[in-house]
Design a protein with these regions (language model features):
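Metal-dependent active-site segment of extracytoplasmic phospho-/sulfohydrolases and closely related
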Residues: 25-27, 35, 255-296
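Structural recognition of the beta-strand scaffold that forms the well-ordered cores
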Residues: 25-29, 36-37, 91-94, 115-117, ...
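Substrate-binding rim/cap in mid-to-C-terminal beta-strand-loop elements of soluble/periplasmic
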Residues: 113-119, 297-324
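Active-site-proximal alpha/beta segments of enzymes that process anionic O-linked groups
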Residues: 22, 40, 44, 65-224
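A short beta-strand-to-alpha-helix junction
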Residues: 71-77, 129-135, 250-254, 303-306, ...
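Bacterial Sec-dependent N-terminal signal peptides
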Residues: 1-22
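Histidine-centered active-site microenvironments of extracellular/periplasmic hydrolases
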Residues: 41, 49, 282-313
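Active-site His/acidic residue clusters
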Residues: 168, 216-262
């Protein structure tokens, strides 16, 4: 029987952790990453299309292509298809009958993140400009528990997370985009990263920073402040897709995989986190594929943009690999 799984189910699974004072979790998202690249690697039809390959089709095929599916997806996401495949679970390969979908009917970012983080697919949340979220999010839920209080934080590339997570109400630090980061600034690395964010080039304008800054802010915070419930949201995948730049989109996916590896290897090497930390990795929405040119887009006008995926790895996750 084919299974249709909502990312809401992932959130419900996490809530049971609060009964165990030793358990930690990290939710990691990357915006608008298609399941097609996760489970099938580089799409050759997009990579040969001069509208999208940035005049480097040869380079893309040299770096990311193999006619063997297992090799091809491992070239793009080596950590996913080694460690997570052997030690965790991956959902969303529709070719195997594993279907992960948005529960909301809109298929863009604010509604997608809201349902993921609050377990509420409220149709009134229908705009990326929606005001502060009325629903309690999972991080807020944990921050109310005595064993997690003040050990919760979130970092995001996009400036909407202070609204999605309702920073004024939630009671934990939420650092997104060009926020004036006042947390952990006693750390020299944090000061330098913040200075680079504020003075560097802004390819995505004033609403979003490059993921490299988000990652190293979050990773520094993880190592120095030791949060027990943590969220990191990356955005380069969506930005480069909207720009129609498939080379940069693939590079962003490859880098995302490398950063997850870095996070996992760190938590498995640190006594505070080792064998007590679960990673949930997912996305907020899908993108088009029925018409290849729609890979750049999502939303209600794109009929397959509701198709998502997710992965788990952690001490209480059975090593079942790619789910069918």
């Amino acid at each position: 029987m084919k299974k249709i799984v909502s990312i809401l189910m992932c959130l419900l699974a996490l809530k049971s952790f609060s009964q165990d004072t030793d358990q930690k979790f990290i939710i990691i998202t990357t915006d608008g990453l298609r399941w097609h690249e996760v489970f099938k690697g580089m799409d050759s039809l997009i990579a040969i299309d001069p509208r999208f390959n940035q005049d480097d089709s040869l380079g893309l095929f040299k770096k990311y292509w193999s006619s063997n599916l297992l090799q091809r997806k491992a070239l793009l996401m080596p950590f996913f298809w080694s460690t997570i495949q052997s030690q965790g679970q991956l959902y969303g390969n529709r070719n195997l009958g594993s279907k992960a979908d948005n529960a909301n009917p809109y298929w863009f970012s604010y509604p997608g993140y809201s349902e993921l983080l609050t377990a509420q697919a409220d149709t009134s949340i229908n705009s990326n400009d929606f005001p502060p979220n009325p629903y309690e999010n999972v991080l807020e839920h944990f921050n109310k528990k005595s064993n997690y209080k003040n050990r919760v934080a979130a970092f995001g590339s996009w400036n909407a997370f202070d609204r999605i997570l309702n920073e004024k109400r939630s009671g934990f630090p939420i650092i997104n985009a060009f926020d004036d980061n006042k947390i952990a600034l006693d750390q020299p690395d944090m000061k330098l990263i913040h200075q680079m964010i504020m003075t560097g080039f802004r390819p995505f304008g004033n609403s979003e920073i490059l993921d490299v800054f988000t990652h190293y802010q979050a990773f520094t915070y993880l190592k120095t402040q030791k949060p027990k419930a943590f969220y990191i949201s990356y955005g380069d995948t969506d930005e480069w897709a909207h720009h129609g730049e498939y080379k940069f989109y693939l590079e962003a996916i490859h880098q995302f995989d490398a950063w997850i590896k870095e996070i996992w290897e760190y938590v498995q090497s640190d006594p505070f986190y080792k064998d007590r930390t679960t990673l949930l990795i997912t996305t907020d929405h899908g993108r088009g594929d029925l018409k290849k040119e729609n890979w750049t887009s999502h939303g209600q006008s794109i009929p397959d943009a509701h198709e998502t995926w997710f992965a788990f790895i952690g001490p209480n996750v059975k090593p079942l690999g790619e789910m069918k």
